[in-house]
């Protein structure tokens, strides 16, 4: 334990001093941005709260391990007519490599529009179903989710986020407890994602993009005769077309990026494995592609 004591007693105080002195931090690292300094402060707060065993390359907090940033360079000047649709994240229970995969697809397909299909956070602690009594506390799970989401936000600073059923769990609990919405903070304020727009659904190029709680995409295109892009169903990743004499519509399920080995996903251990992937739609909504992520 000596090396951990050294970190806490010798290194951590210096990091705190630097993070609390913006001028000094920017002198040490001239390119240091205020948001990066704030990010350092948050890391320190989490270390102080939960302790630290070692600093590793582990992409999420595992036990009491400090997370290494997975944020990637922002892809600039993408074509706004090309859409990247990112599957359910369920942070902090997201596959570490899923961020890199989605960022690669954005650049490969020159996507200037980014949409998260919903359930960006899991809120396992607040589930209406049984939650794991040995899992994270409410505060720790949220801290871990916020920290993980910060990597996604730094990589995709401008995005539209569809609100999923897991995202709204806390809002539902507050509502059923008689708490006025005036007391509830906005998603972007809780998650520190001021550049993201949170919406129930969005229409682009006459495509209905929604979380997917109303049935599968292939069924909805039959009943609504409108193209649909959805998430929610972790085991489905596909594009189906419905063609008539005067119309062509498609239904896309974009898969997900969940870590099936995490305790929060234990409810699905006896079902099909999740389809890890994302979707892109090119040429103003005319060319949908479902892209599986290579595993292993």
Task: Describe these PLM feature segments.
Residues 188-205, 216:
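Short acidic low-complexity segments
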Residues 40-61:
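Short, solvent-exposed alpha-helical "recognition" segments
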Residues 63-96, 108:
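Mobile, glycine- and charge-enriched loop segments
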Residues 2-21:
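Short, amphipathic alpha-helical "recognition" segments used to contact nucleic acids or chromatin
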Residues 205-293:
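Conserved beta-sheet core of the metallophosphoesterase superfamily
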């Amino acid at each position: 334990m000596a090396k951990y004591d050294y970190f806490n007693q010798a290194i951590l105080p210096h990091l705190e001093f630097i993070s609390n002195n913006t001028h000094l931090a920017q002198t040490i690292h001239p390119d240091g941005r205020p948001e990066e300094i704030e990010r350092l402060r948050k890391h320190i707060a989490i270390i102080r709260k939960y302790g630290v065993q070692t600093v590793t390359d582990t992409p999420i907090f595992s036990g009491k391990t400090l997370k290494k940033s997975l944020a990637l360079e922002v892809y600039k000047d993408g074509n706004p007519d090309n859409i990247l649709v990112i599957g359910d994240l369920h942070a902090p229970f997201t596959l570490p490599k899923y961020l890199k995969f989605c960022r690669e697809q954005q650049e490969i397909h020159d996507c200037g529009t980014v949409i998260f299909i919903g359930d960006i956070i899991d809120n396992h602690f607040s589930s209406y179903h049984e939650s794991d009594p040995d899992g994270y506390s409410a505060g720790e799970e949220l801290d871990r989710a916020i920290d993980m989401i910060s990597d996604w936000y730094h990589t995709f600073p401008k995005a539209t986020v569809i609100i999923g059923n897991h995202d709204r769990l806390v809002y539902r609990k507050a509502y059923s407890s008689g708490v006025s919405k005036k007391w509830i903070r906005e998603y972007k304020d809780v998650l520190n994602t001021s550049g993201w727009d949170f919406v129930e659904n969005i229409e682009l190029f006459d495509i209905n993009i929604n979380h997917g709680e109303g049935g599968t995409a292939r069924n909805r295109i039959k009943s609504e005769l409108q193209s649909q892009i959805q998430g929610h169903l972790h085991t489905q990743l596909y594009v189906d077309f419905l063609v008539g004499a005067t119309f062509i519509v498609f239904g896309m399920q974009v898969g997900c990026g969940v870590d099936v080995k995490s305790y929060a996903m234990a409810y699905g251990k006896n079902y099909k494995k999740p389809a890890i992937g994302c979707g892109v739609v090119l040429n103003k909504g005319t060319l949908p592609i479902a892209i599986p992520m290579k595993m292993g």
